Protein backbone atom coordinates (compact mmCIF):
# COMPACT_ATOMS: atom_id res chain seq x y z
CA UNK A 1 0.00 0.00 0.00
CA UNK A 2 2.90 2.37 0.74
CA UNK A 3 4.17 2.03 -2.84
CA UNK A 4 0.65 2.40 -4.17
CA UNK A 5 0.28 5.74 -2.40
CA UNK A 6 3.78 7.05 -3.11
CA UNK A 7 2.71 8.92 -6.23
CA UNK A 8 -0.26 10.34 -4.31
CA UNK A 9 1.91 11.81 -1.57
CA UNK A 10 4.25 13.35 -4.13
CA UNK A 11 1.52 15.09 -6.10
CA UNK A 12 -1.40 17.49 -5.79
CA UNK A 13 -4.95 17.49 -7.11
CA UNK A 14 -5.73 20.10 -9.78
CA UNK A 15 -7.64 22.06 -7.14
CA UNK A 16 -4.68 22.02 -4.73
CA UNK A 17 -2.43 23.12 -7.59
CA UNK A 18 -4.62 26.16 -8.17
CA UNK A 19 -4.86 26.91 -4.45
CA UNK A 20 -1.10 26.57 -3.85
CA UNK A 21 -0.03 29.12 -6.44
CA UNK A 22 0.58 26.54 -9.15
CA UNK A 23 3.14 24.44 -7.30
CA UNK A 24 3.60 20.64 -7.59
CA UNK A 25 2.83 17.87 -10.05
CA UNK A 26 -0.80 17.13 -10.85
CA UNK A 27 -2.56 13.83 -10.21
CA UNK A 28 -5.86 12.51 -11.51
CA UNK A 29 -8.66 11.25 -9.30
CA UNK A 30 -8.15 7.52 -8.72
CA UNK A 31 -11.33 5.58 -7.97
CA UNK A 32 -9.25 2.44 -7.46
CA UNK A 33 -7.55 4.07 -4.48
CA UNK A 34 -10.28 5.28 -2.14
CA UNK A 35 -9.36 6.44 1.36
CA UNK A 36 -12.96 6.91 2.48
CA UNK A 37 -15.33 4.16 1.33
CA UNK A 38 -18.24 6.52 1.95
CA UNK A 39 -17.12 8.49 -1.11
CA UNK A 40 -17.50 5.46 -3.36
CA UNK A 41 -20.78 4.45 -1.73
CA UNK A 42 -22.31 7.88 -2.28
CA UNK A 43 -20.93 8.22 -5.81
CA UNK A 44 -22.51 4.90 -6.77
CA UNK A 45 -25.82 5.90 -5.27
CA UNK A 46 -26.07 9.30 -6.93
CA UNK A 47 -25.09 7.96 -10.33
CA UNK A 48 -27.55 5.06 -10.02
CA UNK A 49 -30.28 7.57 -9.18
CA UNK A 50 -29.58 9.85 -12.16
CA UNK A 51 -32.72 11.21 -13.79
CA UNK A 52 -33.93 14.05 -16.00
CA UNK A 53 -37.24 15.92 -15.77
CA UNK A 54 -37.96 15.51 -19.47
CA UNK A 55 -38.63 11.82 -18.79
CA UNK A 56 -41.54 12.59 -16.46
CA UNK A 57 -44.96 12.91 -18.19
CA UNK A 58 -45.92 16.19 -16.51
CA UNK A 59 -48.40 16.80 -19.34
CA UNK A 60 -50.59 14.14 -17.75
CA UNK A 61 -51.23 16.70 -14.99
CA UNK A 62 -52.80 19.23 -17.37
CA UNK A 63 -56.40 18.12 -16.64
CA UNK A 64 -55.72 18.32 -12.90
CA UNK A 65 -54.07 21.73 -13.32
CA UNK A 66 -57.07 23.11 -15.20
CA UNK A 67 -59.35 22.10 -12.33
CA UNK A 68 -57.44 24.35 -9.92
CA UNK A 69 -58.49 27.94 -9.32
CA UNK A 70 -56.25 30.75 -10.53
CA UNK A 71 -55.31 31.44 -6.90
CA UNK A 72 -54.02 27.90 -6.42
CA UNK A 73 -52.24 27.95 -9.76
CA UNK A 74 -50.49 31.19 -8.81
CA UNK A 75 -49.54 29.76 -5.41
CA UNK A 76 -48.00 26.66 -6.98
CA UNK A 77 -46.09 28.72 -9.53
CA UNK A 78 -44.75 31.09 -6.86
CA UNK A 79 -43.77 28.21 -4.60
CA UNK A 80 -41.85 26.40 -7.32
CA UNK A 81 -40.16 29.61 -8.47
CA UNK A 82 -39.00 30.17 -4.89
CA UNK A 83 -37.58 26.65 -4.87
CA UNK A 84 -35.86 27.39 -8.18
CA UNK A 85 -34.09 30.35 -6.58
CA UNK A 86 -32.79 28.22 -3.71
CA UNK A 87 -31.52 25.53 -6.09
CA UNK A 88 -29.89 28.20 -8.26
CA UNK A 89 -27.96 29.42 -5.22
CA UNK A 90 -27.03 25.89 -4.20
CA UNK A 91 -25.87 24.87 -7.68
CA UNK A 92 -23.83 27.98 -8.43
CA UNK A 93 -22.40 28.82 -4.99
CA UNK A 94 -23.17 26.37 -2.18
CA UNK A 95 -22.03 23.06 -3.61
CA UNK A 96 -19.30 24.60 -5.76
CA UNK A 97 -17.67 26.09 -2.65
CA UNK A 98 -17.61 22.66 -1.00
CA UNK A 99 -15.18 21.49 -3.67
CA UNK A 100 -12.61 23.91 -2.23
CA UNK A 101 -13.00 22.41 1.24
CA UNK A 102 -13.12 18.71 0.30
CA UNK A 103 -11.21 16.19 2.42
CA UNK A 104 -10.51 13.85 -0.52
CA UNK A 105 -10.12 14.01 -4.29
CA UNK A 106 -13.30 11.97 -4.56
CA UNK A 107 -15.27 14.38 -2.41
CA UNK A 108 -14.35 17.12 -4.88
CA UNK A 109 -15.98 15.34 -7.80
CA UNK A 110 -18.96 14.26 -5.71
CA UNK A 111 -19.77 17.89 -4.93
CA UNK A 112 -19.31 18.71 -8.61
CA UNK A 113 -21.93 16.02 -9.27
CA UNK A 114 -24.18 17.44 -6.56
CA UNK A 115 -23.95 20.89 -8.15
CA UNK A 116 -24.97 19.44 -11.51
CA UNK A 117 -27.93 17.56 -10.07
CA UNK A 118 -29.12 20.64 -8.19
CA UNK A 119 -29.00 22.39 -11.56
CA UNK A 120 -31.22 19.59 -12.87
CA UNK A 121 -33.60 20.24 -9.97
CA UNK A 122 -33.80 23.92 -10.90
CA UNK A 123 -34.44 22.92 -14.51
CA UNK A 124 -37.19 20.56 -13.35
CA UNK A 125 -39.33 23.43 -12.13
CA UNK A 126 -38.91 25.03 -15.54
CA UNK A 127 -40.23 21.82 -17.09
CA UNK A 128 -43.28 22.02 -14.85
CA UNK A 129 -43.82 25.69 -15.73
CA UNK A 130 -43.51 25.22 -19.48
CA UNK A 131 -45.98 22.34 -19.36
CA UNK A 132 -48.66 23.75 -17.07
CA UNK A 133 -48.32 27.54 -16.95
CA UNK A 134 -48.85 30.44 -19.30
CA UNK A 135 -45.92 32.72 -20.15
CA UNK A 136 -47.62 35.45 -18.14
CA UNK A 137 -47.85 33.24 -15.05
CA UNK A 138 -44.17 32.32 -15.32
CA UNK A 139 -43.04 35.93 -15.70
CA UNK A 140 -45.23 37.11 -12.82
CA UNK A 141 -43.81 34.38 -10.55
CA UNK A 142 -40.21 35.31 -11.32
CA UNK A 143 -41.03 38.99 -10.73
CA UNK A 144 -42.64 38.01 -7.42
CA UNK A 145 -39.45 36.23 -6.34
CA UNK A 146 -37.37 39.35 -6.98
CA UNK A 147 -39.79 41.62 -5.11
CA UNK A 148 -40.72 39.43 -2.12
CA UNK A 149 -38.59 40.50 0.82
CA UNK A 150 -39.32 37.49 3.05
CA UNK A 151 -38.10 35.16 0.29
CA UNK A 152 -35.07 37.30 -0.47
CA UNK A 153 -34.00 37.37 3.19
CA UNK A 154 -34.04 33.60 3.60
CA UNK A 155 -32.39 33.07 0.21
CA UNK A 156 -29.55 35.46 1.05
CA UNK A 157 -29.01 34.30 4.63
CA UNK A 158 -26.58 31.45 3.88
CA UNK A 159 -24.51 33.00 1.09
CA UNK A 160 -22.04 34.82 3.41
CA UNK A 161 -21.25 31.48 5.07
CA UNK A 162 -20.81 29.74 1.72
CA UNK A 163 -18.20 32.25 0.67
CA UNK A 164 -16.63 32.89 4.10
CA UNK A 165 -13.25 31.75 5.36
CA UNK A 166 -14.49 28.97 7.66
CA UNK A 167 -14.78 25.66 5.76
CA UNK A 168 -16.94 24.01 8.42
CA UNK A 169 -19.43 26.86 8.59
CA UNK A 170 -19.59 26.76 4.81
CA UNK A 171 -20.33 23.03 5.01
CA UNK A 172 -23.17 23.64 7.49
CA UNK A 173 -24.67 26.36 5.31
CA UNK A 174 -24.42 24.23 2.18
CA UNK A 175 -26.20 21.41 3.99
CA UNK A 176 -28.93 23.67 5.40
CA UNK A 177 -30.28 24.62 1.99
CA UNK A 178 -31.21 21.06 0.89
CA UNK A 179 -31.61 19.86 4.48
CA UNK A 180 -34.09 22.45 5.71
CA UNK A 181 -34.96 25.50 3.61
CA UNK A 182 -36.52 23.62 0.72
CA UNK A 183 -39.06 21.66 2.73
CA UNK A 184 -41.60 24.42 3.26
CA UNK A 185 -41.95 24.56 -0.51
CA UNK A 186 -42.01 20.78 -0.83
CA UNK A 187 -45.03 20.67 1.48
CA UNK A 188 -47.37 22.10 -1.15
CA UNK A 189 -47.02 19.42 -3.88
CA UNK A 190 -47.28 16.67 -1.27
CA UNK A 191 -50.41 18.31 0.12
CA UNK A 192 -51.90 18.43 -3.38
CA UNK A 193 -50.85 14.89 -4.22
CA UNK A 194 -52.56 13.60 -1.08
CA UNK A 195 -55.74 15.03 -2.62
CA UNK A 196 -55.11 13.35 -6.00
CA UNK A 197 -53.94 16.58 -7.64
CA UNK A 198 -50.83 16.95 -9.86
CA UNK A 199 -49.47 13.42 -9.18
CA UNK A 200 -46.79 13.54 -11.88
CA UNK A 201 -45.54 16.90 -10.67
CA UNK A 202 -45.28 15.39 -7.20
CA UNK A 203 -43.24 12.54 -8.65
CA UNK A 204 -40.66 15.10 -9.78
CA UNK A 205 -40.54 16.50 -6.25
CA UNK A 206 -40.05 12.99 -4.87
CA UNK A 207 -37.11 12.45 -7.22
CA UNK A 208 -35.64 15.77 -6.10
CA UNK A 209 -36.21 14.79 -2.47
CA UNK A 210 -34.46 11.46 -3.03
CA UNK A 211 -31.39 13.35 -4.23
CA UNK A 212 -31.58 15.77 -1.30
CA UNK A 213 -31.62 12.89 1.20
CA UNK A 214 -28.32 11.56 -0.17
CA UNK A 215 -26.86 15.07 -0.29
CA UNK A 216 -27.83 15.73 3.33
CA UNK A 217 -26.52 12.38 4.50
CA UNK A 218 -23.15 12.88 2.82
CA UNK A 219 -22.70 16.47 4.00
CA UNK A 220 -23.62 15.43 7.54
CA UNK A 221 -21.13 12.58 7.41
CA UNK A 222 -18.31 14.85 6.20
CA UNK A 223 -19.23 17.44 8.83
CA UNK A 224 -18.98 14.87 11.60
CA UNK A 225 -15.60 13.62 10.32
CA UNK A 226 -14.24 17.15 10.60
CA UNK A 227 -15.84 17.96 13.95
CA UNK A 228 -14.52 14.81 15.64
CA UNK A 229 -10.97 16.07 15.08
CA UNK A 230 -11.64 19.32 16.94
CA UNK A 231 -11.11 20.09 20.62
CA UNK A 232 -14.10 19.86 22.98
CA UNK A 233 -14.19 23.64 23.16
CA UNK A 234 -14.27 24.00 19.39
CA UNK A 235 -16.92 21.30 19.12
CA UNK A 236 -19.12 23.18 21.58
CA UNK A 237 -18.53 26.41 19.68
CA UNK A 238 -19.54 24.76 16.40
CA UNK A 239 -22.68 23.30 17.97
CA UNK A 240 -23.71 26.77 19.16
CA UNK A 241 -23.15 28.12 15.67
CA UNK A 242 -25.27 25.38 14.08
CA UNK A 243 -28.19 25.85 16.47
CA UNK A 244 -28.07 29.66 16.36
CA UNK A 245 -28.10 29.62 12.57
CA UNK A 246 -30.88 27.05 12.51
CA UNK A 247 -33.12 29.09 14.81
CA UNK A 248 -32.43 32.21 12.74
CA UNK A 249 -33.48 30.37 9.59
CA UNK A 250 -36.59 28.96 11.25
CA UNK A 251 -37.81 32.48 12.00
CA UNK A 252 -37.13 33.55 8.41
CA UNK A 253 -38.90 30.44 7.16
CA UNK A 254 -41.96 31.05 9.32
CA UNK A 255 -42.26 34.61 8.02
CA UNK A 256 -41.96 33.42 4.43
CA UNK A 257 -44.43 30.56 4.73
CA UNK A 258 -47.00 32.76 6.49
CA UNK A 259 -46.81 35.23 3.62
CA UNK A 260 -46.74 32.56 0.89
CA UNK A 261 -49.53 30.29 2.14
CA UNK A 262 -51.80 32.89 3.78
CA UNK A 263 -55.44 32.22 2.96
CA UNK A 264 -54.92 28.62 1.81
CA UNK A 265 -55.28 26.90 5.19
CA UNK A 266 -51.90 25.18 5.20
CA UNK A 267 -49.57 27.63 6.98
CA UNK A 268 -49.30 25.85 10.33
CA UNK A 269 -48.94 22.38 8.82
CA UNK A 270 -46.25 23.60 6.42
CA UNK A 271 -44.33 25.15 9.32
CA UNK A 272 -44.52 21.89 11.28
CA UNK A 273 -43.28 20.03 8.22
CA UNK A 274 -40.31 22.40 7.99
CA UNK A 275 -39.47 22.13 11.69
CA UNK A 276 -39.71 18.34 11.51
CA UNK A 277 -37.06 18.41 8.80
CA UNK A 278 -34.99 20.91 10.79
CA UNK A 279 -34.80 18.25 13.50
CA UNK A 280 -33.80 15.63 10.93
CA UNK A 281 -31.10 17.96 9.65
CA UNK A 282 -29.63 18.40 13.14
CA UNK A 283 -29.65 14.64 13.69
CA UNK A 284 -27.81 14.25 10.41
CA UNK A 285 -25.03 16.43 11.84
CA UNK A 286 -24.88 14.27 14.96
CA UNK A 287 -27.03 16.42 17.26
CA UNK A 288 -30.31 15.67 19.00
CA UNK A 289 -33.44 17.38 17.75
CA UNK A 290 -34.66 19.98 20.28
CA UNK A 291 -38.19 20.15 18.87
CA UNK A 292 -41.28 18.74 20.56
CA UNK A 293 -43.71 16.24 19.11
CA UNK A 294 -46.33 18.97 18.85
CA UNK A 295 -43.97 21.23 16.89
CA UNK A 296 -43.21 18.47 14.39
CA UNK A 297 -46.52 16.63 14.08
CA UNK A 298 -47.19 15.84 10.42
CA UNK A 299 -50.51 14.56 9.16
CA UNK A 300 -50.49 10.89 8.08
CA UNK A 301 -51.51 11.68 4.51
CA UNK A 302 -48.40 13.83 4.07
CA UNK A 303 -46.16 11.11 5.48
CA UNK A 304 -47.79 8.72 3.03
CA UNK A 305 -46.73 10.99 0.18
CA UNK A 306 -43.14 10.88 1.39
CA UNK A 307 -43.05 7.10 1.29
CA UNK A 308 -45.39 6.12 -1.54
CA UNK A 309 -43.40 5.59 -4.75
CA UNK A 310 -40.56 7.57 -3.23
CA UNK A 311 -38.65 5.07 -1.13
CA UNK A 312 -34.95 5.44 -1.83
CA UNK A 313 -34.69 1.76 -2.69
CA UNK A 314 -37.57 1.91 -5.15
CA UNK A 315 -36.74 1.36 -8.80
CA UNK A 316 -37.86 4.67 -10.28
CA UNK A 317 -36.77 3.56 -13.72
CA UNK A 318 -38.98 0.49 -13.99
CA UNK A 319 -42.19 2.40 -14.55
CA UNK A 320 -43.84 0.40 -11.74
CA UNK A 321 -45.51 2.73 -9.28
CA UNK A 322 -43.75 5.76 -10.71
CA UNK A 323 -44.30 7.99 -13.68
CA UNK A 324 -40.67 7.81 -14.79
CA UNK A 325 -40.87 6.60 -18.38
CA UNK A 326 -37.92 5.29 -20.37
CA UNK A 327 -38.09 5.53 -24.13
CA UNK A 328 -38.18 2.42 -26.32
CA UNK A 329 -36.04 2.55 -29.46
CA UNK A 330 -36.98 1.03 -32.79
CA UNK A 331 -34.88 0.77 -35.92
CA UNK A 332 -36.14 2.88 -38.83
CA UNK A 333 -35.86 2.69 -42.58
CA UNK A 334 -35.58 5.49 -45.16
CA UNK A 335 -39.26 5.16 -46.04
CA UNK A 336 -40.21 5.92 -42.44
CA UNK A 337 -39.04 9.50 -42.99
CA UNK A 338 -41.08 10.13 -46.15
CA UNK A 339 -43.86 12.36 -44.85
UniProtKB/Swiss-Prot annotation:
Entry superkingdom: Bacteria
EC number: 1.17.4.1
Gene3D superfamilies from the UniProt entry: Ribonucleotide Reductase, subunit A
Binding site for Fe cation 1: 87, 121
Keyword vocabulary terms for this entry: Deoxyribonucleotide synthesis, Iron, Metal-binding, Oxidoreductase
One Gene Ontology term, aspect cellular component: ribonucleoside-diphosphate reductase complex
Enzyme class: oxidoreductase
Location of the active site: 125
Gene Ontology terms: biological process: deoxyribonucleotide biosynthetic process
Note describing how the cofactor binds: Binds 2 iron ions per subunit.
Residues annotated as binding Fe cation 2: 215
Family indicated by similarity: Belongs to the ribonucleoside diphosphate reductase small chain family.
Binding partners and assembly: Tetramer of two alpha and two beta subunits.
Function: Provides the precursors necessary for DNA synthesis. Catalyzes the biosynthesis of deoxyribonucleotides from the corresponding ribonucleotides.
Stated name of the protein: Ribonucleoside-diphosphate reductase subunit beta
Organism: Mycoplasma pneumoniae (strain ATCC 29342 / M129 / Subtype 1) (Mycoplasmoides pneumoniae)
Amino acid sequence: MANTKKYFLESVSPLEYAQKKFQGNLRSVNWNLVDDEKDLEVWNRITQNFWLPEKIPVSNDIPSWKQLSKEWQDLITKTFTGLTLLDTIQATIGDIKQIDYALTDHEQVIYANFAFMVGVHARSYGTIFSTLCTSEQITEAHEWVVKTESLQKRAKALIPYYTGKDPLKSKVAAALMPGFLLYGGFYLPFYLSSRKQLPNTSDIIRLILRDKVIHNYYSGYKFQRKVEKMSKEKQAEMKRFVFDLMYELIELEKAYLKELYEGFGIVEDAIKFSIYNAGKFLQNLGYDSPFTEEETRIKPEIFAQLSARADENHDFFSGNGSSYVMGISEETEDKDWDF
